[in-house]
Amino acid sequence: MIIILGAMDSEIDEFLSRLENRQEILWNGFTQHRGRLEGQEVLVSKSGVGKVMSAMVTQHLIDRWQPQAVIFTGLAGSLRPHIEIGDTLLACDLVQHDLESVALNLPRGQVPFSEHRFMPAHPVLLELAAGYQPACGRLHQGRICTGDQFITYREMNSHAYLTEELEGDGVEMEGASVALVCSVNRVPFLVARTISDRADEDAATNFEAFLPQASRNSLDLVRYLLREMALVDLGEN
């Protein structure tokens, strides 16, 4: 079983029409869709927006299905000029940018009393996904910063740490929480985002307009990855 997640229904819609032998499972207001895609048994679900919702759903699905891997897709904002709208960003690692424990003398993003700060994607999944050739835009690898904020131009002056301290390449609201849950549970994971905006004054408008294209791009990438995963052993995370 491979878990495929997106924050919102619109980020997973394209997957649902492609599922073979599709079955719906209801859990606490979430509709989860079990079936087969590219010959692999998968479960596609909305995670909900933000760190708490996405962590909750991810932990439930890991407990319920003991998946081989978790793949999270959807949209992100770019933090770098060379990563443009329409490009695809594969997360080499992820960090919670809004986790700050200065009183404990810990660096930003460090989970107190743990080893978790920058959470790396599974190397085999990352290597496989790096072979994907998007129909539009370019493919990048980099660091994704996650927080319970939708970053726009108004916030960027006070969020310079995203690039200066954390050296982030993209920003979104779920990836690092999913990565943390997967890391603790030793489940291989990959976060792949389509760039919808530049975290600027047009971010909200671009985000809404780009959802359909992002969902199609996510489907293409995941279908490619599923085909490649059938040929390898992920081993232990």
Can you say where each PLM-predicted feature lies in the sequence?
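Short, conserved "active-site rim" segments that organize catalytic pockets and cofactor/ligand binding
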Residues: 1-19, 41
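Glycine-rich phosphate- or other oxyanion-binding loops that anchor nucleotides, phosphorylated ligands
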Residues: 2, 26-237
